[in-house]
A protein has these predicted regions:
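Short helix/strand-capping connector loops at secondary-structure junctions
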Residues: 226-239
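Short metal-coordination and nucleic-acid-contact micro-motifs, chiefly zinc-binding Cys/His arrays
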Residues: 16-18, 34, 103-106, 183
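Short, glycine-/small-residue-rich phosphate/pyrophosphate-handling segment
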Residues: 176-222
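Cysteine-rich micro-motifs
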Residues: 33-45
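Short Cys/His-rich zinc-binding micro-motifs
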Residues: 21-31
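The −1 position to Zn-ligating cysteines in a subset of zinc-ribbon hairpins
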Residues: 21, 37, 109
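N-terminal beta1-alpha1-beta2 submodule of the flavodoxin-like/Rossmannoid cofactor-binding fold
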Residues: 4-14, 26-27, 42, 50-177, ...
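Generic recognition of short, well-ordered alpha-helical segments
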Residues: 33-36, 80-81, 158-162, 200-203
């Protein structure tokens, strides 16, 4: 598994007292190690990351294959576990990728410039103060994206919804007669949750990428739920001992890679007719 900022810091400075921030609610604790749990939101210790002065996310322009995005508010929870499974396949297949846990980044709400006039919503996005400009650039540079999402009230997390809202400036390129940056790219969607809403969540996510011109990999959606009759505290053990979530996650990632390697984007360049909302 990849090393988290928490693990890297602990290895480098095992006895140093530093501030630890809960990536879920923002509570800050100072100590050699993070607390056993967050007293505010009750998240476990693995949701804490070393607190440091915020630096805006940047992108160096280096091309890579796949963006892997954990859209949960819990960076190391059940959605994080599903993302870990996906990341393992990416490493095994030797494709270049970048993983992002959205809870570790600052993404502002969409300003809805399009509501003023279509031309006001343009790329690059007018909001250049948060981390989204780098994400925009990486969506344009990568060949595929794999979204991993929890189910919150029969839908995606609010954090992921804000991220997808902020891609409006890329979708709107088609409406203001400018070349698109995402058509023909490949998407895969992974969803997990305590109970109902998996298919709806996946379809809501897919609609966004469909409007950006992405191609869904064959068998490109997988989901796994536990059940409303169980206490959610048992979900973690269930998922980590479940063979189906492993098999289906690995399958989707494999299918994304195989579809990406067909180079569909290049073959379709200049041949597509944008039809978007």
């Amino acid at each position: 598994m990849h090393k988290t900022p928490l693990e890297i810091s602990l290895k480098a400075n095992p006895d140093q007292k530093i501030p630890w921030r809960c990536a879920v609610c923002g509570f800050v604790f100072t100590g050699e190690k993070p607390p056993k749990g967050c007293p505010v939101c009750h998240s476990p210790s693995y949701e804490f990351i070393p607190e440091k002065d915020r630096q805006q996310l940047t992108y160096n322009g280096e091309k890579f294959d796949i963006m892997l995005i954990n859209g949960s508010s819990h960076r190391a929870g059940n959605t994080g576990y599903m993302a870990d499974l996906a990341e393992a396949v990416l490493r095994e297949r030797g494709v270049s990728y970048r993983r992002f846990n959205l809870s570790e980044y600052v993404i502002d709400y969409c300003w809805c410039c399009y509501a003023v006039r279509a031309e006001s919503c343009a790329y690059p996005c007018r909001n250049k103060k948060d981390d989204m400009p780098a994400f925009h650039a990486m969506l344009a540079a990568s060949k595929a994206v794999i979204i991993v999402s929890p189910i919150n009230w029969n839908g995606m997390s609010a954090r992921l919804k804000v991220f997808l809202d902020r891609t409006t400036c890329m979708e709107n390129l088609f409406h203001i007669n400018k070349p698109g940056l995402t058509e023909g790219k490949v998407a895969g969607i992974l969803v997990q949750g305590h109970e109902d809403g998996a298919i709806k969540t996946a379809m809501d996510i897919w609609l966004n990428f469909q409007q950006l011109g992405y191609v869904l990999a064959p068998f490109g959606i997988a989901f796994r739920t536990h059940g409303s009759h169980f206490n959610s505290v048992t979900d973690r053990e269930f998922f980590q001992n479940d063979e189906l979530i492993v098999r289906h996650t690995r399958g989707v990632v494999n299918n994304v890679i195989e579809t990406m390697q067909l180079d569909i984007g290049e073959k379709l360049k200049g041949k597509l007719v944008p039809v978007t909302e």
